[in-house]
Amino acid sequence: MKKLIFIIMVGSLFMGCFPITMQSLSQSSKVKAGMTTDEVRDIMGEPVMTELDRNVEEWHYCKFVVNKDRYLAIFFVDNKVIAKIFYTQAERMGDCSLFVKTGDYKVPPEVQAILDAPVDSIDTN
């Protein structure tokens, strides 16, 4: 029993040395199609990662959960939400922000259609 307590204490010390991202995903139901990036930021806070591919901007939020990290990806075109997805990742251990777009991540079909469109057919206003 003493050995188990010692192992737990030492493990806790090491876990305290690693940054862990704990974003709240509980407000995600408030994010709706057509919202602007500013409106989403007001609801969700700053994303852990953003990407821009052609005219699709993608924001990622994550929450470290033991054995299965939870993620939210929000997709914008012309500064407006067009899609959002939840996904999980359980294969790797560590801060969830390091494993964005892994696990069961899939680009939503409506976003993939935009990414697959010929470059000259994309409206860049």
Stretches found by the model and what they are:
Residues 1-4:
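Positively charged n-region of N-terminal signal peptides that target proteins for export
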Residues 6-9:
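Internal alpha-helical transmembrane segments of multi-pass membrane proteins, especially GPCRs
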Residues 18-125:
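Residues within mature, well-folded domains
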Residues 14-16:
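C-terminal motif of bacterial Sec signal peptides marking the signal peptidase cleavage site
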